[in-house]
């Protein structure tokens, strides 16, 4: 029934799109969306909020959130122009908009009829370290067709830098009609924003049983491995792992490790972790978007997640646990050689893990390395805003 209902919505949206074809697009309307049209997150959220705060803006911006509970919560908290794409009125509004601005490849309505006059603008939700889109390894025929239909809609794609242009070019099916933009990630404007440290402390201090002094003086580590489509992702994947020893070490060094799982994939943690008070879950149900709070952590540990690129803005160290690197390269694949796109210490054992988290030495990142990712803490939203204004060409 669910599949039939979705198919009916797609059929209706495309029929409505055909009906709207003779009418001119509204140059002043921009529609934003994010994952599945049900979330309010990623780069589209931050650019939407930036543009709506510009008093001189002639743009009318709307953000599609089809989750009724979340939409109501956002509206009640003071957000404006948060809409559903399920009503007839809003479908017309969306189909007549000059620009669709997306964090993912999902359109704001189930329409796959491309209008050459419309700007379909891809912001992305992280610099692609892994193969994505049409460049992903081992794509099924059904997924390939689905991606082809969606990807062909885009007119402009953020590729961050010249270093990553070929990556996005392959991901978007080597489409030469797309304009690839060397612009940064809007969400990165929030990382070093004023009072970020206060925000994170107020948000997460209640998650653990720490005294105020203990919490504020602690070394805070964000441990956030990425997804696997072939197995559960393992936290602390060491054959010599000792939870009792880890607990003792964290207490002695006044370290708190915040573990963050990918919201859409399964994870596995070793026994005994649940008894360590200094290991605190910080998943999406507690903190939907961790980006604005990255400056509050002293060290990041990951495996293949692109979140470490955002974290480099803080000029703090990153460590990597590539415990299944060969398998990941074969089944998922990287957009660039792994050792070329990572800069930090590699951890292969529990003893190395303790050494890294207990050591504060860090030599920093080179300018050349940072330029590959177009890493900057300000001006990202503004450059996208100016680009969109230029493309729309308001009178």
Where are these regions (language model features)?
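Membrane-proximal basic amphipathic "stem/tether" segments
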Residues: 1-37, 42
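A nucleotide-sugar donor-handling region in carbohydrate enzymes
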Residues: 2-17, 133, 146-231, 263, ...
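Active-site and donor-binding regions of nucleotide-sugar-utilizing enzymes
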Residues: 29-195
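Donor nucleotide-activated moiety binding/catalytic core segment of transferases
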Residues: 83-99, 263-309
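A donor-sugar binding/catalytic signature common to diverse glycosyltransferases
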Residues: 100-107, 111-124, 128-131, 287-331
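C-terminal alpha-helical cap of glycosyltransferases
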Residues: 376-395
């Amino acid at each position: 029934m669910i599949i039939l209902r979705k198919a009916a919505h797609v059929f209706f949206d495309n029929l409505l799109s055909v009906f709207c074809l003779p009418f001119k697009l509204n140059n002043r309307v921009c529609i934003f969306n994010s994952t599945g049209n049900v979330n309010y997150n990623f780069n589209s959220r931050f650019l939407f909020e930036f543009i709506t705060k510009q008093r001189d803006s002639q743009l009318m911006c709307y953000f599609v959130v089809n989750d009724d509970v979340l939409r109501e919560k956002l509206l009640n908290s003071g957000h404006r122009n948060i809409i559903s794409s399920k009503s007839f009125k809003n479908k017309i509004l969306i189909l007549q908009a000059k620009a669709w601005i997306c964090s993912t490849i999902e359109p704001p309505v189930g329409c796959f009829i491309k209008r050459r006059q419309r700007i379909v603008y891809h912001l992305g939700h992280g610099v692609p370290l892994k193969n994505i889109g049409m460049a992903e390894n081992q794509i099924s025929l059904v997924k390939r067709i689905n991606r082809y239909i969606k990807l062909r809609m885009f007119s402009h794609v953020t590729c961050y830098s010249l270093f990553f242009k070929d990556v996005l070019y392959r991901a978007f099916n080597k489409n030469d009609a797309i304009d690839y933009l060397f612009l940064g990630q809007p969400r990165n404007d929030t990382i070093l924003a004023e009072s970020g440290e206060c925000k994170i402390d107020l948000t997460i201090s209640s998650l653990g049983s720490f005294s105020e002094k203990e919490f504020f003086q602690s070394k805070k580590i964000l441990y956030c491995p990425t997804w696997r489509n072939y197995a559960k992702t393992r936290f602390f994947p060491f054959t010599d792992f000792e939870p009792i020893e880890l607990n003792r070490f964290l207490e002695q060094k006044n370290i708190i490790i915040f573990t963050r799982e990918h919201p859409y994939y399964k994870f596995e943690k070793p026994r005994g972790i649940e008894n360590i008070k200094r290991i605190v879950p910080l998943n999406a149900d507690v903190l939907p978007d961790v980006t604005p709070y990255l400056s509050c952590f002293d060290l990041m540990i990951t495996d293949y997640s692109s979140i470490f690129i955002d974290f480099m803005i803080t000029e703090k160290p990153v460590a990597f646990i590539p415990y299944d690197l060969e398998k990941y390269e074969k089944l998922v694949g990287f957009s660039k050689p792994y050792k070329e796109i990572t800069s930090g210490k590699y951890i292969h054992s529990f003893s190395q893990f303790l050494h890294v988290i207990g050591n504060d030495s860090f030599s920093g990142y080179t300018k050349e390395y940072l330029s590959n990712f177009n890493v900057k803490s300000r001006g990202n939203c503004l450059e996208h805003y100016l680009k969109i204004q230029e493309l729309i060409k308001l009178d």
